[in-house]
Curated annotation (Swiss-Prot):
Biological source species: Achromobacter lyticus
Family according to the record: Belongs to the peptidase M4 family.
Protein name as catalogued: Achromolysin
Enzyme Commission code: 3.4.24.-
Lipid metabolism found in the keyword field: no
Length: 119
């Protein structure tokens, strides 16, 4: 459901708020006060590892971490538009380039990040 809120962005493009100022809400599953990125294109919590299958969840509706911008919110939102489970790195390459541009990162840095986690 489109009910999650929280910060996004970075120092390069500035901070913005999901669910406010014309930005869409985050697509999350809600159970009581727990909100989970368990949707069609789920976002997995790797717990600082390189593999896993548990969807990330938080007590909400606002997803913040120590008041900082939330890269996880951006990954979940932009991943919906640029990456689907049926794509692979080569097929999703254009989406990766577009996501990098939208978030103000260099394409090389984003591609390197995917390679480091085995994608």
């Amino acid at each position: 459901a489109q009910v999650g809120t929280g910060p996004g962005g970075n120092q390069k493009i500035g901070q913005y708020e999901y669910g406010s100022g014309g930005r869409p809400f985050l697509d999350v599953a809600q159970s009581g006060s727990t909100y989970t990125f368990n949707t069609t294109n789920l976002t997995v919590n790797l717990n600082h590892g390189t593999s896993g299958s548990t969807a990330y969840s938080y007590t909400g509706p606002r997803n913040t971490i120590n008041g900082a911008y939330s890269p996880l919110n951006d990954a979940h939102y932009f991943g919906r538009d640029y990456w689907t489970p049926s794509t692979n790195f080569n097929q999703g390459g254009q989406g990766v380039r577009q996501a990098a541009a939208d978030l103000g990162y260099s394409t090389a840095d984003v591609i390197d990040a995917f390679r480091q986690v085995g994608v």
